Every structure is written in C-alpha cells, then in structure tokens.
Amino acid sequence: MKNCLGIELGNYRIKIAYMEKNVLAEYFSERIENGEKPDHRLIAQTVRELLAEKNVRCKKAVFVLKQEDSYVKRVHMPLMTVDQLKLNLPYEFHDYTGDRSADYRYDYALIDRDEKEMDLLAAACRKDLCEEIAEIAKLAKLKIAGIVPAAVGLERILERAEGGEKDREKKDFAVLDLRNRAVMIHFFRKGIYDMTRNMEPGCSEIELLVGKNKEKLTEFGLDADE
C-alpha cells in the first residue's frame, strides 16, 4: 500500500499517521478529555474532522491496537498445515484467555521454518474489539486495510530505520514507551518482537514526584524534605 492511514484509538488520545507513496506525510492527534471513552459516533466524527482539517483524503486505514488490547508472543510449533495451525493456535494463548478462547481472534506471521518446526509471531485480540473498530471505520467512511498490535507497528518502524535490507544482519532493540500511567519497555530480538515489560510509575506520577507532591511521595515511601 503506497498510501495508507495508521490510526490508534487510545484512552487519552486519537493518533493518526498518513503515509503517502511510502513516506510519512502527516502525523496529528487529538486529546480525549479526562480519558473518557466516547461513543463510536463521536470517535468516528473526530477522525473525520481531523482528516478534513489536514486535507487528507485517503480511505485505507490500518488500526493499531493498544498494548493492553492484544496478546502477542513468539512461539515455536511443530510443522503443520494452516488448518491444523488454526485449531492449535488458541492453546498457545490459554494462559491469557482461559475459558474465553472462543471470544478471541487469532493471527500469525511465519518468521522461519524447517522440516520439523515453525517459528511464528502470533497474536490474539478480542472479537468484540475488532467489531468495534469495524463499526468506527464504517462510521468514519474508512476501509480497514488491517488491524495490528502496537508491537508489530514498532517492528515495522525498526525495520524501516534499519534500511529494510533483507540480507542485512538484524540487531536487538529495546524501545522505551513513556505513558501517563506506566512505562513500558518493548524488546526485539534480531528485529522481531520478543516481549514487553511494564514499570511503574508512569509519566504523570513521575511529574508529581519531581514536583514534590506530598501525597504521591508518601505513596512511594519517599520523604518530601529530602
């Protein structure tokens, strides 16, 4: 896709990136006040207004799932057919989905394979969330080109930063993701997503700590006079 939108519907902000002829042409966002989750029509209206304001007419969109809205893991499985993989993939996420595995959609990307084993990057996302995104896209008059986890989006950015050369040796990366309520570190092994680790506090709490907010300092067991 030479021209495409990338849209992330966050808890506090709607973010939109526009790629034109494989080059980032626009990036803009709109804050959602108080972190409230508005209804689908309001989200769609906000997206349409942002696109109109920037005079962006592209209708193809890839929606990016927030880290907490999907499960992504690298798995090694015995070599099997596509039908067998569809049957077995949900079991790889049983620790996360429990008895609700039927409520999720699953997908994968083949990293490597040999005569006995497959190396996969697998993902799971709630069906109802996919349906919500489809409804918002329809209301915003956009065509869904894909729904991808945030980690996969970061993987593509790293690949592009490396020059996108297939024969070039891939490096290990750690991406620091600064958020309001938490700090996340995403690890990539040889350019491929591996895992995410969460740390607290987030940026909003760090700001309070730096400002010597007594209540927050007490919460973290710190002395305001030090």
Give the ranges of each region predicted by the language model.
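Gly/Thr-rich phosphate-binding beta-strand-loop-beta motif of the actin/hexokinase/Hsp70
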Residues: 1-30, 61-66, 160-205
